[in-house]
Amino acid sequence: VKLGLFFDLRNPGPWARPSVDHVARSIDIVIGAEAAGIDAVWLSEHHLFPDGYLPQPLAFACALAARTSRVRIGTAIMIAPLHHPAHLAEQAALADLISNGRIEVGLGTGYSPEEFALFGQSLDRRYGRTDATLAELRRLLDGGIVTPGPVQNPFPLWAGYQGPQGAARAGRLGVGLLSLDRNNAAIYAEALEANGHGASSARLGGVIDLIVCDDPEATSRRLVPHLAWQRQTYAVARGVEQTFEQAVAGIEAKLAETGRLPGLPVLTPDDAVDLVRKRTDGLPVEHVYLWASLAGMPDDLVERHVELVCSRLRPALGGA
């Protein structure tokens, strides 16, 4: 299993630093993590978020490619219906050249009406359009059509699909599946086999929501507003009416009731290793990635989390 860090470059108002400094610091975190042994970094895409969420992952991938030499750099995910396939293919090929063959491209459908309106697109048929974009990327990148072409052939493509229908779609396309849902692995493998790709070509990857630390109880308390910010902004993007204060109150109530943050395990390194193994054992998992930072998370928590991921989790999980 290749272990990675997941970046969205959020820089929320309550904890914001100048954008130039924030981007530079994010690059420095990647450089340091590479030196400490991390296998990959993965980048997400959103638009119009109030905290400067990363809007152009492949542009940032090029910056990382120029400053690193070994880590793989993936997108998880780019919103396919907001991008022309030829434009995507050219960007991916150039990033692959800059990195000397270290790019992975994962695409998904998106869900935010505001994002689609920004690009003059409709949410209608977004699943079919994402399928078509993945197929066209395969043709453009592997067929020698875009110039200059990428280093890698075949080019590593992923579908950020969830649920049984998404697993079947990824299998039909013959691409990797960015989902660690154990219930869908067999559906994905069967679709690969049925469509001539071979079940042995199955590649799974995905995020595990997890923060690693020395003191889970104290760290959990400090993470409440940052988790609330992340959850509230995602909810608003999906059309749910919720304030930041409501999100904080809900998470604080859950923490008081259970002693745990809802949906975010905060664990010591040994417990974190056990969790990742439980999620991945017996599956054809190629990549697992954890958030590098959570919406303005304090620097000391970020630094210790990244240090423990690199020094304790990666060796235990047999990173490549």
Place the predicted regions along the sequence by residue.
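Internal, glycine-rich beta/alpha segment that forms the wall or movable "lid"
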Residues: 84-201
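N-terminal beta1-alpha1-beta2 module of alpha/beta enzyme domains
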Residues: 1-68, 72
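Short, acidic/polar
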Residues: 20-32, 91, 161-168, 271-279
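Hydrophobic faces of well-ordered beta-strands that scaffold small-molecule active sites
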Residues: 3-7, 41-43, 73-75, 103-107, ...
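Active-site mouth loops of central-metabolism enzymes
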Residues: 9-23, 78-86, 154-161, 213, ...
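An alpha-helical appendage that flanks or caps ligand/catalytic pockets
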Residues: 124-147, 185-286, 318
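Alpha-helix-loop-beta-strand connector modules within alpha/beta enzyme cores
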Residues: 51-75, 129-136, 307-319
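N-terminal small/glycine-rich loop or linker at the start of catalytic domains
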Residues: 1-17, 112-115, 142-153, 242-261
